Amino acid sequence: MLKEFLSYFQDFKKGILANILISFGLINDRSALKALPFKYPLGITPNYPFHDITRLTTLSPGEPILIYRRSFKLNWYFVQKSFYSGWINTKDLIEVSKKTFFDYNKSARTLILMESKVCTEELPTIGKFHFQMGDKLVLANEVETNRFYFKMNTLFPEGCYPVKIPL
């Protein structure tokens, strides 16, 4: 099953040493995948200070990634997504076991977004999540949904999809 999953990753075997231990992770908040691990945006000119030229793409909550290395200060991971590899801040992902990783990604209950941008309602303890077109969301089962709403002390709103996001 691992080989099948890794076959989806572009150029997986090129340049990756056999002795590198691969960890598994899931994105827990919308975040930037960067070419270089800089905390602040690196702009082209002073007129565009917030146009970060080191940003490769944006990752959405719940996306699967492979973790290869940690930075020296341990606040960045070098990761691989299907078509990109780069650096991501450690606060934007959660390391999970191999079993959890595959269980989450092989879930039969999924929803593919067809709108350009979608966001969840803001909850005081969690916040608000932003998604983009094409994101695959794993839906929570009935037990997980009831547990969440019991913990939050609120009722389940009709017509909503309970999304499972790694926290």
How would you name each of these model-derived features?
Residues I65:
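Mid-sequence acidic-hydrophobic segments that form the walls
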